[in-house]
Amino acid sequence: MTDDRDKTNEDPEKIIEADFNPEDPDDADIAEDAKEGLVVATDVLPSTLPIIPLRPRPAFPGILTPMVFTGEKHVALAKRAVDTPSKMMGLVLAKEVDEPDSLENLHRFGVVGRVMKVLHTDDDSIHLLVNCLERFSIRELTESEEGLFARVDYHYATELSVNPELKAYSMAIITTLKELVQINPLYSEEIKMFLNRQSMDDPGRLTDFAANLTSGDGQLLQEILETIDVRNRIDKVLVLLKKELEVSRLQTKISKQIEQKVSAQQREFFLREQLKAIKKELGLEKEGKVSEIEKYQKRLKNLTLSEEAQKTIDEEIEKLRLIEPSSPEYNVSRNYLDWLTILPWGKFSKDNYNIERARRVLDRDHYGLKDVKDRILEFIAVGMLKGDISGSILCLVGPPGVGKTSIGKSIAAALNRTFYRFSLGGMRDEAEIKGHRRTYIGAMPGRFIQAMKSAGTANPVLMLDEIDKVGASFQGDPASALLEVLDPEQNSSFRDHYLDVPFDLSNVLFVATANQLDTIPAPLLDRMEIIRLAGYILEEKLEIARRYLIPKALENHGLKKGQVTIRKDALRAIIDGYAREAGVRNLENRIKKIMRHAAMEFSQGRTDKITVSKKDVAAILGKPIFTEEEVFEDVPGVVTGLAWTSMGGATLQIEATAMPSRNKGFKQTGQLGKVMVESSDIAYSYVMAHLEEYGADPEFFDKHFVHLHVPAGATPKDGPSAGVTMATALLSMITGKPVIKKLGMTGELTLTGKVLPIGGVKEKIIAVKRIGLTTVILPEANRKDFEELPDHLRENLSVHFAGDYRDVYQVAFG
């Protein structure tokens, strides 16, 4: 059985309270009969009762309880009780709501009830109005095919002499009930019905009524039902009523807050509507649609539109006039017009082609990078002669942290143009570039049209960051969509899917950035002018730290100039031990950590000035990440190669060894990529074919198994430039001769012994200087690259250029 106060638990066979209306004549007669005592405690009650399990709360004596019986078993039991002369049944609370009916799942106290009214329905359920009479305890409980039956002992309500204490407690219950009625009027009808049937001078009946009135937990109510002593029962009911009172107060408070909020919103709505009507009558405000159209027409006066765009906007405005504002199509049309009229059609910022000013801006924002700055100044000079720099698409390629993005900002500042940047990294949807068609819900233009809106001019500098990291998926290939945008012959009439009218992007200066070119599709790469940023050498990093990074870090950490001094030897230690990458991002992070350390010292009053020297670096920054690169000298079969990664230059110690074996063979280890494995195979074949020429045993490979290893084994490696180094390691191992001291080499080797050019000469020379090598072998074709390096990189180096491996051999083995 459930009632309106608790309907959270449902059971396939259950009994719930039905509607009982005291205004109904039949129901009123029943109530009157109960009041007149047609069923009273002195009636003879049967000693054996059919038991109906109740869920989720018990019934109480003296209460008229409407019930609905569902489920074949419960309906049969109810009908059997109705058909008996006494029309009585035992109502007992089940222990567990979700458990089926059983002997173990029943409490041992219940209420006997007499059926007062029966109503049959078409849904195989039966509605009863039951007058609950007296408590009983179960003496014996049995189960048969017909259901549960119990022999019971009744606990009749006895007339008590109402002493002052009981009367006081009864008045406390009545007072609490009155408070409940004042807070929640829903209780008033039930209290009125009770007063019509019972006397307030009966404390027992009063406590039962009060307990039944609450929404307490079923097990707690069962405990009250089982309390025979009226005085103890009153204590428990009073506690329950106080809780009910607090809940009712809280519910009332919440209801009032909600009503006040709703009322305030309604009041504000009505006032706004009245204000709108008053303004409309005074001519101070026009209808929303009219004002929207006037807004678009006002925008159009300041734009220079193409013929197609003008026609499209005019047609869309006429369409908007005919659409009701409540229509979903109205918002679609309005958003479309918003985009069309907010774009900078024909709006240009005036370019500044002053070369000296551009040079000052570039020098102010960046240290070094002379070749890059010269290329940008040349680019601006050409624009000055032509009168515009339309159709230009630059691609800045270099390691992370070398200033690619900031160079784009400097270009915009030098030209007096608006700068806008967005990242292409991880973009996998072609609609991100060309927009979504307006038929889709939530459609919007692509990133380029959004950028033009944000820039506010038709000739901004748009930076396409991380263009080498564009992806592809089933939603399309953004790199292919970029072909139209970055083609000077096509982007003058770029057609976004959302706008569906051509927009001129030919006056935009596109500046793309990338860490590498390998992942950029060839057609896209062909449309861009490549400018390489090789990275910074140690001396440049020192100067960048002194001029830019340290002053910026001081300001960002609330420190004054002179409070923190980082000596040059400390900066060198930081660069060598913590920030060897080509850029300065890690160097900046380490300087920030020093500033945070200083801020902590100052805030705790330990000192007011800090000077950081080389010996202090490890204490502040922790153990160095990079250790000194060890060069193995006088060891046959070990040669130092030069490598180039996206993080800058590095050295590789290539090792070769051989084991006497009847089964000749060759294997490589060290996580080598496909290209590097091919280079090792070429080196192996070349050495095998020229053993006699280099004074080695021509049958060496027939009698040995050869192993080539490139540490560190956990780091993946690839590229063709280690070919000459691998061949030299093999020859050194076979002949037993070590190479000369402090030697590094790089170059791609062919099967015929030709040495082909490689990339990253500057980065590799930086690595050479860092570990202290003095002799370097480079491909002859890279002579020009080496000669373009700054003097401080070339000095104190003995550089040999090789066009054939024989040149390498002569230098390596003296």
From Swiss-Prot:
Any one GO cellular component localisation term in the record: cytoplasm
Keyword field: ATP-binding, Cytoplasm, Hydrolase, Nucleotide-binding, Protease, Serine protease, Stress response
Subcellular location, record wording: Cytoplasm
List of residues binding ATP: G398, P399, P400, G401, V402, G403, K404, T405
Gene3D superfamilies xref list: 1.10.8.60, 1.20.5.5270, 1.20.58.1480, 3.30.230.10, LON domain-like, P-loop containing nucleotide triphosphate hydrolases
Assigned EC number: 3.4.21.53
GO molecular function: ATP binding; ATP hydrolysis activity; ATP-dependent peptidase activity; sequence-specific DNA binding; serine-type endopeptidase activity
Catalytic center residues: S721, K764
Domain Lon N-terminal: 49-245
Pfam families hit by this protein: AAA (PF00004), Lon_C (PF05362), Lon_lid (PF22667), LON_substr_bdg (PF02190)
Induction comment: By heat shock.
Start and end residues of each Lon proteolytic domain: 633-814
Composition skew (Basic and acidic residues), residue ranges: 1-17
GO biological-process terms attached to the record: cellular response to heat; protein quality control for misfolded or incompletely synthesized proteins
InterPro entries linked: AAA+_ATPase, ATPase_AAA_core, Lon_bac, Lon_bac/euk-typ, Lon_lid, Lon_proteolytic, Lon_Prtase, Lon_prtase_N
Reactions the enzyme catalyzes: Hydrolysis of proteins in presence of ATP
Superkingdom as given in the UniProt entry: Bacteria
Family the UniProt entry places it in: Belongs to the peptidase S16 family.
Complexes and interactors: Homohexamer. Organized in a ring with a central cavity.
Job description of the protein: ATP-dependent serine protease that mediates the selective degradation of mutant and abnormal proteins as well as certain short-lived regulatory proteins. Required for cellular homeostasis and for survival from DNA damage and developmental changes induced by stress. Degrades polypeptides processively to yield small peptide fragments that are 5 to 10 amino acids long. Binds to DNA in a double-stranded, site-specific manner.
HAMAP family in the cross-refs: lon_bact
NCBIfam families reported for this sequence: lon
Protein name, per record: Lon protease 1
Species of provenance: Syntrophotalea carbinolica (strain DSM 2380 / NBRC 103641 / GraBd1)
Phylogenetic classification of the source organism: Bacteria, Pseudomonadati, Thermodesulfobacteriota, Desulfuromonadia, Desulfuromonadales
